[in-house]
């Protein structure tokens, strides 16, 4: 991207763009687009085999729904002379059904062994936020009388993982996402202020912070420095695990929840159940992208190599 900045180009051709790592693709595209957007006859041509639900997928779906100005062209294998059902059968026998669907049927397939069923992920439709600013995407403005919950994950702000939180409307079932924050540069010292401001705007939302690593620092700042009252606590019950609430259910109480193997296993199971039974509606692109690469590794689920699972 640094080689392109400051240049002037009439046409930029991006080949197999879907195979560029997501973080690199987003940075590159944000650098490239301004170099050609000022001309009247300039063009961006993107050609690629589908490869999961990444930036190429987002550009394609936005074009299908007339949310951007790209013209899409889909070249199916059946349009190539000499390719018939016999060729299809032989190709699948020499490769695999999944590879054929991606390479020749032009299907956007996520990774294998994902937590959420791939067929369910494929039905998730994302929408553009009504307002975006400095990492915060808002899909719905606060409604009077509605109940909101903010769930936050804290990173160190070193460009690797993202500090993130999601605002859920839990007033009625199905639950829905009304706002999302995601930033890989925000420092833990400043993150509590952002959580505080957004939670306060959403009717003094209940806030649950993951307190592994430096998350405890953020939860402590919310409780004692910013004096935010609606912070969800967890009571430690030994082998019985952790019980979230106001911290009055017995046992040693802590601010937020600490993710252990047992907590993660239960959380993944519950998340899978409420999404696949349509009790939680997902309409955020970044979250859908993370679900498409959140896979089983050993006895637990985590992001595929080169991807993130902060949301």
Predicted stretch roles:
Residues 8, 49-115, 246-247, 253-254, ...:
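Conserved P-loop NTPase catalytic core
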Residues 41-49:
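Structural recognition of the conserved hydrophobic beta-strand(s) that form the central parallel beta-sheet
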Residues 145, 158-164, 174:
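Short, flexible loop/turn motifs enriched in small residues
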Residues 299-311:
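Acidic, Mg2+-coordinating catalytic module of metal-dependent nucleases/exonucleases
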Residues 19-22, 157, 214:
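Residues immediately C-terminal
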Residues 53, 171-298:
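Mg2+-dependent endonuclease catalytic cores in nucleic-acid-processing enzymes, primarily RNase H-like
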Residues 3, 27, 79-154:
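ATPase catalytic-site recognition across NTP-hydrolyzing enzymes
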Residues 1-35:
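Conserved RecA-like ASCE ATPase "motif II neighborhood" in helicase/translocase motors
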């Amino acid at each position: 991207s640094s080689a392109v900045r400051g240049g002037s180009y009439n046409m930029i051709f991006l080949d197999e763009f879907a195979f560029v790592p997501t973080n690199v693709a987003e940075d590159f595209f944000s650098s490239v687009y301004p170099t050609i957007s000022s001309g009247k006859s300039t063009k961006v041509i993107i050609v690629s085999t589908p490869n999961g639900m990444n930036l190429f997928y987002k550009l394609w779906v936005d074009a299908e729904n007339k949310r951007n100005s790209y013209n899409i062209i889909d070249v199916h294998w059946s349009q190539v002379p000499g390719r018939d059902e016999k060729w299809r059968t032989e190709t699948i026998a020499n490769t695999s059904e999944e590879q054929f669907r991606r390479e020749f049927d032009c299907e956007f397939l996520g990774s294998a062994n994902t937590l959420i069923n791939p067929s369910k992920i494929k039905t998730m439709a994302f929408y553009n936020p009504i307002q975006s600013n400095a990492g915060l995407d808002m899909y719905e403005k606060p409604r009077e009388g509605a109940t909101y919950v903010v769930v936050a994950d804290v990173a160190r702000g070193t460009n690797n993982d993202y500090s993130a939180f999601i605002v859920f409307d839990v007033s009625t079932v199905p639950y829905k996402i009304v706002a999302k924050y995601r930033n890989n540069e925000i420092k833990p010292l400043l993150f509590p202020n952002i959580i505080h401001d957004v939670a306060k705007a959403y009717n003094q939302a209940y806030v649950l912070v993951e307190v592994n690593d430096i998350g405890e620092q953020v939860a402590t700042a919310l409780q004692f420095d910013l004096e935010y009252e609606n912070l969800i606590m967890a009571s430690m019950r030994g082998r019985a695990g952790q019980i979230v609430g106001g911290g009055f259910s017995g046992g040693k109480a802590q601010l937020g929840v600490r993710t252990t193997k047992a907590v993660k296993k239960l959380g993944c199971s519950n998340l899978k159940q409420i999404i696949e039974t349509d009790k939680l509606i997902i309409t955020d692109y970044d979250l859908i992208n993370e679900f498409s690469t959140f896979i089983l590794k050993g006895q637990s689920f985590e992001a595929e190599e080169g991807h993130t699972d902060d949301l």
